[in-house]
Swiss-Prot record:
Record's protein name: LPS-assembly protein LptD
Position of the signal peptide: 1-33
Membrane-spanning parts: none
Keywords carried by this UniProt record: Cell outer membrane, Membrane, Signal
Role played: Together with LptE, is involved in the assembly of lipopolysaccharide (LPS) at the surface of the outer membrane.
Organism for this UniProt entry: Pseudomonas aeruginosa (strain LESB58)
Region Disordered: start-end pairs: 58-101
One GO BP: Gram-negative-bacterium-type cell outer membrane assembly
Length: 929
């Protein structure tokens, strides 16, 4: 919150009337003082006042004030009334230092003196700014000058009061009754005031309020320096409106630059009637210009009980970043024992920062992780690193293991100019067991491999060129070493002219696939075999490396109307390979009856005719008007067969069948296999759209009709491969490929929205040839737009048509019984009352009769603090030996405490699994922010 300091004039040219008046210092104006004096500005800038002849000599009675007031006018236990009688003073105002940091109810029973508005009196717009668990909000009232941004030396001074008196000899103006002083954005109010012209000082007594941009200070007595805006308010309470923060102090001082100093001050985000937590310090400083506060000899109190002491603390008073400790987290697992992480954040500059993560692990020692982030006008990125001298000896004899365990990485995106873009994503780890043994706070995307990629892209008007170098480092010992692309060059685009509406486009690629296979046999101390990498089991063409060039020119003629379209397409697909095969690969070619040719090419035409129609009508369902669409689509695809069994597979797989598969040009991903096709895809989509554009429901269904068997397959899935494997092992349970059927499974995809809060989506694939469901899923999601705190997810997934890569053979195979997916996933966040919610998730695998993850707990949330307590069970993966991947169950109890305005105290790790496990959790938290 930026606050501009207020500077009063050196000479305070007072203008007093019975209402609000203004005066510029150079103006020679006539002044009247509430029918008491006739005052004029003298030549020296002082006052020249004389009593009016018919003036009433009596001012309204002076308000009685507390014994704590510094004003001499209010001192003593009694005052004299107009008739000379003695009037007893009102009961002594309670000191804020005696209230334990709570707001003084004696000033107003409903805390309106702090601009507190209860929830039931807030407007709809104001309610949208607070959580459902908040009982109200601090609302700054609209007042003249509150948004005044003019320089203080150019701002006039305004004074108003019900009555006034001026002592010319002492040059003191006395004001009484609803006194208001305002200059620029600063305003001071009180029951009465004395303005000392010689000292440029004002003294206000009774119900004092000092307002500045977004801040209010309330007290019994105030001293204001009129030439620079300094002020002191005694027995003070304060509010920072936007931060929803308040506090109190023996006295509060406002400096010339609008910094607030509190003596024996408190700070909290709790509501006026509550003190769940309070930060108390001998000297507290609040700087609205920077958004931070400091406190010395500070004590954190929870329910008035001291729980933490620090000689100095630096804390935020708004949402701006600051250096300091972040919420620590602790846990206990079998791998690390008790773990404590105490992150420290460095706010180095507006465009770069750093975070240090000291991680103490009882079983492994002290690990240091660090992250540096930067942002410039043309680039952004992250640099991270970690180091641990591991004292755990569990993997002491494992290959590729060292007690010095480390990680370093760089992510960078740089726009060299409007057309050139450079990207780097490089991470390296010390050993393949790193993520199995150690947690990380560095945001690594995968725990089975790390990416090592650099890309340079140029975007022209009609083309895009890209130079890419990409490698991977495995973080497991049970997978085959992946291929590296060193380099990969692509050039894609279209011709700028379209003769007769014909569009010409092209796609080109050159890539070098390489990898270093690990064929070593690792031995135990006694000389026996300990294990081998999966690389050692690769045979034949699976051990190939080489270059691949792919050219794909094409032309199409889109013909589009409002009622439909027809687009014929013709492409030419040419691929050339220059291959290498090591000696072990050549020796084992006969294993799968393969042939190696170092130079191969493949050329194929592709013909596609895509067409669709669009129909719509107005209809009524359940009393609601809809626009229903009917969108039939047909696509014919022809690609001739060409034998590709002796071409190795570098980056190709076959995605699972779905409704989107109907419209693919190639049933394989990657370019090492181009599927033969002579087929017609038919599909239809219908939608129900309301008059406001809201799509209530959609349903799509379709099927492919084959005019020829699909002969091109991945290694291990062709009829020849399956026959060869059966001949070697007649008892082998192998699934027959569905390549000679004249039709595909029926593919369905649908979505229905009960309203904007409830929706269900589903996909379903049923094979009429086997009368079996090959895959399907149904997902239900509930999250109201106006109350995203309510979240319900329920889903079920089934799939038995998967294909997987077998690292022990280096070939693909159909999923076996153990690979069938039958899982349900249920998660919920539900408020029981505005402040209490339950959180839970249960993910279960019916095929293996086991729980994959389950957690449950509760959350308490208020305007000033939050608590979560969650019990969690989950499966972890651990490589104890080559080709031996063990799954083990972990359990943990996670506690998270957040003191709003100070940040979390413990347990930020809960955020990670809640965000990953519950769809809608992030939207809920973003709305709360």
């Amino acid at each position: 919150m930026a606050v501009k300091s207020l500077v009063f004039r050196r000479k305070f040219p007072l203008l007093v009337t019975g209402s609000l008046l203004a005066l510029q210092p150079v103006a020679a104006l006539t002044v009247q003082a509430a029918d008491q004096f006739d005052c004029k500005v003298s030549a020296t800038g002082g006052w020249d006042c004389s009593p009016l002849q018919n003036a009433n000599a009596n001012l309204p009675p002076r308000p009685a004030h507390t014994a704590t007031s510094v004003s001499t006018a209010a001192a003593g236990s009694s005052v004299s009334g107009s008739g000379g009688e003695t009037v007893e003073a009102e009961p002594t105002q309670r000191l804020v230092t005696e209230s334990g940091g709570r707001a003084l109810k004696s000033r107003s029973a409903d805390y309106s003196h702090l601009d507190w508005i209860p929830r039931e009196k807030l407007t709809a717009a104001q309610l949208a700014e607070i959580g459902p668990y908040c009982g109200g909000s601090y609302i700054e009232p609209v007042r003249p000058g509150m948004d005044d941004g003019a320089p203080s030396d150019e701002s006039p001074t305004y004074v108003s009061a019900k009555a006034s008196r001026y002592e010319q000899e002492k040059q003191i103006a006395t004001l009484a009754g609803d006194v208001v002083l305002r200059q620029g954005s600063m305003q001071v109010e009180g029951d009465e005031a004395n303005l000392h012209q010689l000292e440029n000082r004002g003294e206000l007594v009774g119900n004092v309020k000092l307002r500045d941009k977004g801040m209010l200070v309330v007290g019994d007595h105030a001293q204001v320096q009129l030439d620079n805006g300094e002020a002191q308010v005694d027995n003070a309470e304060y509010v920072i409106h936007k931060a929803h923060a308040r506090g109190s102090a023996l006295y509060a001082k406002r400096s010339e630059n609008a910094i607030i100093m509190l003596k024996d001050g408190t700070y909290t985000r709790c509501e006026p009637s509550s003190n769940a937590w309070t930060l108390k310090g001998n000297n507290v400083k609040l700087n609205p210009a920077t958004g931070f506060g400091t406190a010395t000899n500070a004590t954190l109190r929870v329910k008035d009980f001291p729980v933490f002491y620090t000689p100095y603390i630096y804390f935020p008073i708004d949402d701006r970043r600051q250096s300091g400790f972040l919420p620590p987290s602790f846990s206990s697992t079998s791998d690390t024992g008790f773990t404590l992480v105490t992150p420290y954040y460095f706010n180095l500059a507006p465009n770069y920062d750093a975070t240090l993560y000291p991680r103490y692990m009882a079983k492994r020692g002290m690990m240091l992780e660090g992250e540096f982030r930067y942002l410039t006008h043309s680039s952004e990125g992250t640099v991270n690193a970690a180091y641990l001298n591991d004292k755990d000896d569990h993997r002491e004899n494992f290959p590729d293991y060292s007690k010095d365990r480390w990680l370093y990485g760089l992510k960078n995106t740089t726009g060299l100019d409007s057309r050139w873009l450079a990207e780097v994503d490089y991470t390296r780890i010390s050993d393949p067991y790193y993520f199995q043994d150690l947690d990380t706070d560095l945001g690594v995307g995968s725990t089975t491999y790390v990416n090592q990629r650099g890309t340079l892209t140029y975007r022209g008007d009609t083309f895009t060129g890209r130079l890419n170098a990409q490698a991977y480092q495995l973080a497991t010992t049970t997978d085959v070493t992946p291929y590296e692309r060193l380099p990969q060059i692509t050039f894609d685009g279209f011709l700028p002219y379209e003769p007769g509406g014909v569009k010409f486009n092209y796609s080109t690629e050159f890539v070098r696939f390489d990898r270093d296979l690990d064929d070593n046999i690792y031995l135990n101390d006694d000389g026996s075999e300990w294990g081998r990498r999966p690389d050692a089991y690769l045979q034949g063409l699976a051990r190939s490396t080489g270059d691949r060039v792919h050219l794909e020119p094409g032309m199409s003629l889109p013909m589009t109307r409002s009622w439909g379209y027809l687009t014929p397409t013709l492409k030419y697909l040419y691929t050339k390979y220059d291959l290498d095969l090591d000696s072990q690969g050549k020796r084992t070619l006969t294993t799968y009856d393969e042939t190696f040719d170092s130079s191969q090419d493949r050329s194929l035409p592709l013909v596609k005719v895509d067409s669709g129609l669009y129909f719509d009508r107005d209809t009524t369902l359940a009393g609601t008007q809809f626009r229903q669409t009917l969108e039939p689509r047909a696509m014919y695809l022809y690609v001739p067969y060409k034998d590709q069994e002796n071409i190795p597979v570098f980056d190709t797989s076959e995605p699972s069948f779905s409704y989107d598969s109907l419209w693919r040009e190639n049933r394989f991903s990657g370019r090492d296999r181009i599927g033969d096709a002579n087929q017609l895809s038919l599909g239809v989509t219908t939608r129900f759209i309301e008059s406001n554009g809201f799509e209530r429901a959609s349903l799509s269904a379709g099927q492919i009709y084959y005019f020829r068997d699909r002969r091109v397959q991945l290694p291990g899935l062709s009829e020849k491969d399956l026959a060869l494997m059966r001949s070697k092992n007649p008892n082998l349970d192998l699934k027959d490929p569905d390549t000679d059927s004249w039709r595909s499974p029926y593919a369905l995809m649908g979505q229905y929205r009960f309203n904007r809060d409830w929706r269900v989506s589903s996909d379903f694939n049923w094979n009429p040839n086997t009368s079996r469901t090959e895959s399907g899923s149904a997902m239900f999601h509930y999250q109201p737009e106006d109350n995203p705190n309510k979240v319900v997810n329920a889903g079920y997934r089934y799939r038995e048509d998967s294909r997987r890569f077998n690292s022990s053979t280096g070939r693909f195979e159909y999923g076996r019984e153990n690979d069938i997916i039958k899982q349900h996933d249920f998660s919920v966040i539900w408020p029981l009352v505005p402040q209490w919610s339950v959180l839970a998730r249960w993910q279960y695998d019916y095929n293996k009769n086991r729980t994959l993850e389950a957690f449950g707990g509760f959350e308490y949330d208020s305007c000033c603090w939050k608590l979560r307590l969650i019990n969690r069970y989950w499966l972890d993966v651990d490589d104890d030996a080559f080709l031996n991947q063990n799954e083990k169950a972990d359990r943990g109890i996670f506690l998270q405490i957040v003191l709003k305005g100070l940040g979390g105290i413990v347990g930020n790790k809960t955020e990670m699994f809640l965000d990953k496990g519950i769809q809608g959790y992030r939207q809920r938290e973003d709305q709360a922010m």
